[in-house]
C-alpha cells in the first residue's frame, strides 16, 4: 500500500463508487482549488488501485502553521483495520510535511440508528476503531449533544427512500403531515427554483427563522458562495401562493356549496322533519361560512400584501447518495399555507424521481426532551417518518503538540 496525493480523476472515480458526504465531492474540490488553493486530495493505493480517499482543506493557525479539516472523511473501508491504521498513520506524516499544527477528523461513520424519539434501533460497535485511532494520537472529542459553531452536527434526521415510491412514502408519514401536504396542493401552493441572483428572496425568509428561533447562522454571501461551490448540485427553492388564483378557487367552491344548500332547503320544505337533511344542511352551512371567511381574509391579504405571497424557502444540496435539506426560513404570518410542507414534498419527490435513496433533513440537537431547543423541529421531521442517525463524532490529532497547546491557551484566553 502507498499513501499518495490523488489526481482529480482518481478521487472522482473512487467517490463515485462509494457512499460519501456532499463535502467529499469534485464540486467542492474545484471551487476550493480554483478560488483558494487550500484543498488537498490524498488517499491510499494498492496495486495502482485507489482504496481510500479524502478531501482535506487547510486554514491558517498561529500565523506560520495550518489547521486541516477532513470534511466527513476519509472515505475508506473502516472494517479493514490494516487499511485504516495505514491511512491515519501516514496522514500524520503528510500533515507534518504540510506545516500542520493540528487536524480535525470527523468520519461519516454511524454510532447509532435511533427512532425519532431517540430510542436506539441499531448500535455500531466503534470501540476498536476509536482505540486504534487513540493509539495513533487521534483524540476522540466525546459524544456531543446540541449545535456547535466549531464542528459538524453529530445528529442527523434521515428519511429512507430506497425502493419506495411516492404512495409508500406518504402512507408511512404521520396522518397530519400527510394531510398538510395534501392541503398545500388543494390551496394551490406552488414551488419554483430561484436563481442565484434571487438569493435575497431566500435570505429574507431565512432571517425570519433566525429571528423566530433567536440564532445567527450565516450571511447572504455564504449562501451565494455555497451555490457557486455546488453549482450543478444545489437549489434554492421557494414555496409561494398566488392569492388571486386561491380566491377564485375558494369562490368556485363557495358557489357550489350555495347551490347544494339551496337544494337542501328546498328538500326541507317538502319534508320538514328529515333529520338527515337538517344535519347535512347544518354541516354545509358551516363549511360555507368557513369559505366566506377565507374569501374575505384573502381579499384583505391581497389589499395589504399583494397578489403573490412568498411562504417559505430552502437551500438544498444533492448527490447520488442524498438530498440534503440544509437551511430554510418561512414567514410566520403565512403559516396557514404550510409552505414548508410543500417544499419538503417537492424535494422528496425529486429524490425519488432521480433514484436518490436518502432524504437528509440534516441536523438536530440529539436532545429528545420536550424542553430541547429544537423540539418543534424534531416533531416536524418525525411527521415525515424520518429516523435519527447518530455519528461517531470528532477526532483531533495534534501534529506539533507543544505549539498546539499554545494555540489552545491563546484560543481559551480570547474566549474568556
Label the predicted regions.
Residues 3-47, 51-64, 138-150, 160-334:
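A conserved beta-strand-loop-helix scaffold within acyl/acetyltransferase catalytic domains
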Amino acid at each position: 500500500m502507498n499513501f499518495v496525493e490523488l489526481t482529480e480523476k482518481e478521487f472522482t472515480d473512487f467517490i463515485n463508487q462509494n457512499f460519501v458526504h456532499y463535502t467529499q465531492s469534485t464540486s467542492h474540490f474545484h471551487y476550493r482549488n480554483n478560488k483558494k488553493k487550500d484543498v488537498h486530495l490524498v488517499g491510499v493505493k494498492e496495486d495502482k488501485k485507489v482504496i481510500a480517499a479524502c478531501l482535506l482543506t487547510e486554514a491558517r493557525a498561529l500565523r506560520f502553521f495550518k489547521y486541516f479539516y477532513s470534511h466527513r472523511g476519509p472515505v475508506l473501508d473502516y472494517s479493514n483495520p490494516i487499511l485504516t491504521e495505514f491511512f491515519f498513520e501516514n496522514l500524520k506524516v503528510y500533515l507534518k510535511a504540510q506545516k500542520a499544527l493540528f487536524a480535525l477528523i470527523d468520519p461519516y461513520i454511524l454510532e447509532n440508528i435511533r427512532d425519532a424519539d431517540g430510542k436506539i434501533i441499531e448500535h455500531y460497535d466503534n470501540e476498536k476503531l476509536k482505540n486504534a485511532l487513540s493509539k495513533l494520537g487521534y483524540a476522540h472529542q466525546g459524544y456531543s449533544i446540541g449545535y456547535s459553531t466549531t464542528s459538524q452536527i453529530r445528529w442527523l434526521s434521515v428519511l429512507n427512500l430506497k425502493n419506495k415510491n411516492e404512495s409508500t412514502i406518504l402512507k408511512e408519514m404521520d396522518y397530519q403531515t400527510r394531510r398538510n401536504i395534501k392541503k398545500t396542493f388543494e390551496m394551490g401552493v406552488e414551488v419554483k427554483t430561484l436563481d442565484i441572483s434571487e438569493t435575497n428572496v431566500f435570505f429574507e425568509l431565512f432571517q425570519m427563522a433566525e429571528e423566530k428561533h433567536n440564532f445567527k447562522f450565516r450571511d447572504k454571501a455564504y449562501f451565494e458562495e455555497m451555490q457557486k461551490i455546488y453549482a450543478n448540485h444545489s437549489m434554492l427553492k421557494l414555496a409561494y401562493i398566488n392569492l388571486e388564483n386561491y380566491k377564485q378557487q375558494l369562490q368556485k367552491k363557495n358557489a357550489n356549496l350555495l347551490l347544494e344548500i339551496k337544494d337542501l332547503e328546498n328538500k326541507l320544505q317538502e319534508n320538514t322533519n328529515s333529520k338527515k337533511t337538517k344535519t347535512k344542511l347544518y354541516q354545509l352551512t358551516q363549511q360555507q361560512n368557513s369559505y366566506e371567511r377565507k374569501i374575505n381574509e384573502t381579499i384583505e391579504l391581497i389589499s395589504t400584501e399583494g397578489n403573490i405571497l412568498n411562504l417559505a424557502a430552502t437551500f438544498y444540496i444533492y448527490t447520488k447518495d442524498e438530498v440534503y435539506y440544509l437551511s430554510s426560513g418561512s414567514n410566520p404570518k403565512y403559516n396557514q399555507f404550510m409552505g414548508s410542507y410543500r417544499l419538503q414534498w417537492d424535494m422528496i419527490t425529486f429524490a425519488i424521481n432521480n433514484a436518490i435513496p436518502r432524504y437528509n433533513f440534516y441536523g438536530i440537537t440529539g436532545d429528545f426532551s420536550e424542553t430541547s431547543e429544537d423540539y418543534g423541529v424534531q416533531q416536524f421531521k418525525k411527521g415525515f417518518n424520518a429516523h435519527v442517525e447518530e455519528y461517531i463524532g470528532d477526532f483531533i490529532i495534534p501534529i506539533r503538540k507543544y505549539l498546539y497547546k499554545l494555540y489552545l491557551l491563546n484560543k481559551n484566553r480570547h474566549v474568556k
